[in-house]
Curated annotation (Swiss-Prot):
One of its GO terms (biological process) is 'de novo' AMP biosynthetic process. It comes from Thiobacillus denitrificans (strain ATCC 25259 / T1). InterPro entries: Adenylosuccin_syn_GTP-bd, Adenylosuccin_syn_Lys_AS, Adenylosuccinate_synth_dom1, Adenylosuccinate_synth_dom2, Adenylosuccinate_synth_dom3, Adenylosuccinate_synthetase, P-loop_NTPase. It comes from the Bacteria. This is Adenylosuccinate synthetase. Its main location: cytoplasm. It catalyses: IMP + L-aspartate + GTP = N(6)-(1,2-dicarboxyethyl)-AMP + GDP + phosphate + 2 H(+). Binds 1 Mg(2+) ion per subunit. Pathway: Purine metabolism; AMP biosynthesis via de novo pathway; AMP from IMP: step 1/2. It is found in: Cytoplasm. Keywords: Cytoplasm, GTP-binding, Ligase, Magnesium, Metal-binding, Nucleotide-binding, Purine biosynthesis. PANTHER family: ADENYLOSUCCINATE SYNTHETASE (PTHR11846:SF0). Homodimer. CDD domains: AdSS (cd03108).
Amino acid sequence: MAAKNVVVIGTQWGDEGKGKIVDWLTDRAQGVVRFQGGHNAGHTLVVGGKKTVLHLIPSGILRDNVTCYIGNGVVLAPDALLKEMDMLEAAGVDVASRLKISEACPLIMPHHVALDQAREIAKGAGKIGTTGRGIGPAYEDKVARRALRLQDLFHRERFAAKLGEVLDHHNFMLKNYYKVEVVSFNQTLDGMMAMAERLKPMVADVPRSLYEANKAGGNLLFEGAQGTLLDIDHGTYPFVTSSNCTAGGAATGSGVGPSAMHYVLGITKAYTTRVGSGPFPTELFDDVGQYLGEKGHEFGATTGRQRRCGWFDAAALKRSIQINGVSGLCVTKLDVLDGLETVRVCVGYKIDGEACDILPVGAESITNVEPIYEDLPGWSDTTVGVQMFDKLPQKAQTYLKRMEELCEVPVDVVSTGPDRVETIVRRHPYEA
């Protein structure tokens, strides 16, 4: 049978529940690929009631026979990776023999973290709300063609020469502009070299490995981090992350051609959340917003920050569906809406008195939009753990069907709880 590749993408501002869905889909995949972002992602998996949070290693690591890949589009913090490996291996998960890392990954280093944190402090109230982990500065170095890549780590003299140049540049900024302490060359060099030996066995030609896996009939799963509305090009710029979190990023960030992406699964919550700064048209500041946050346990897996909550935004989802070429939707956290008398859906916006049915481009265009709502009846029966669509409360079914009508894409999967088994499958992505 020919191999099939599925891309999992967040369609909102991240935190849509991708980790659980990737973990569930790995049942059908022989390889799972991270293709963008860094250890700013927080993917929470619950298996048999046991909770694991992964930041860098693909969620497929919890399945014994799955090979995990970190593609060239990921910025790699070696210390964070080794810490995560140690945590998993202490829990009995074999990582080292099942993880392949692209030699082209740019490295996140101490000067990137120092810059990230100094900038956020300097911006004060105008801050973007980064995780302070050096992600943005590492991507900047990549684009400026001065990044140190994983392959450089195994050549001490080459690494030292490049590091000297890069530190001259960044330390000048840290000292003279941000007025903070500079980063030590010797400490950085010794620290990075100390990690090289453990990393070396996992370094691979990832594009070739993925090509060979497909050729041998293996299904691949591409695991997106963050969400479409945080994409550097298509998100609510400048309140965005520094990578392409859209389906197109799966191709560039892994070295697998776009024609090999056979199905794109867009993950969306049954409501909307956002972490950090930036426009959010359907944000709620009332008791309902509080209720969604508490019932949905809306605290970031990476930062612990409380997420902002609001109604489901079909106009924003429509933008994500078009950008990603979404084949089908997976709706998560439906149970959080259980018990609400009325459920509101944003179907468009008023902008300067004119109606618009799709999210405008860029933060400035979105800041003053007025959402246009459609009210749907809520349901009182629980949806928790339901595994058949027709066993959902009738009004919950109506809500999901309305979502399909508004977005013109089928709801193929519904998540009704954090565990793998709490899933309704209407059309399986690997069978679609």
